[in-house]
C-alpha cells in the first residue's frame, strides 16, 4: 500500500504539473502571445489574510454608487415622464439594485470561503512539512523504508500544489470582489 500511495502521489504531482502547463499556455494565448512563446510569468501575490478588511455593508453601498449601468438607468428614470416607460424603468432599477446587492454578497461569501480554504491548505502543507521532517529522521535511523519516505515527499508536493492553487483561488475571489465593489457587479442578466 505504501508503494501504491507513493505512485498515486507521484501521479497526482505529474497531473498537477500538466494542468499547470496547460493553464500557462492558455494564459499566454489569452494575453496575445503565441502558444509556444516563453514570456516570463511572475508570482501572483496572495492577499494578506490579516489585512483583509472587507465590510460588506459599506462595500454594497459603494458598489451601488459606482455601477455605471445603474447610474445611467437612474438618470434615465429621473428624466422619464410618468407612465408605463417610467414604471418599467423603475422596476429595472430596483431589480438591478437587488442584483448588485446579491452579487456583492455572493462574491463576499466566495472571498471568505476562499480565504478559509487557503488557510486550511496552508496548515495542511505545514503539517506535511513537519511529517516529512520526522520521516526523514526515521529514515536516517533506518526505521522507515525508502518507499515510505518517497510517499511522504510526494504528499508534501501534493500539499504544496494544493496550497498554491488555493492561493490563486483566493486571489481570484479577492479580485472578483474588489471589481464588483468598484462598479462591475452584475447588474443585468
Language model features with spans:
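Charged, solvent-exposed structural "stalk/scaffold" segments
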Residues: 1-14, 116-164, 179
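Extracellular, luminal, or virion-exposed ectodomains of exported proteins
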Residues: 1-12, 26, 81-88, 95-98, ...
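A glycine-/polar-enriched beta->alpha junction
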Residues: 61-71, 78-87, 94-98, 116, ...
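Short, solvent-exposed, mixed-charge loop/turn linkers that connect secondary-structure elements
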Residues: 17-58, 175-189
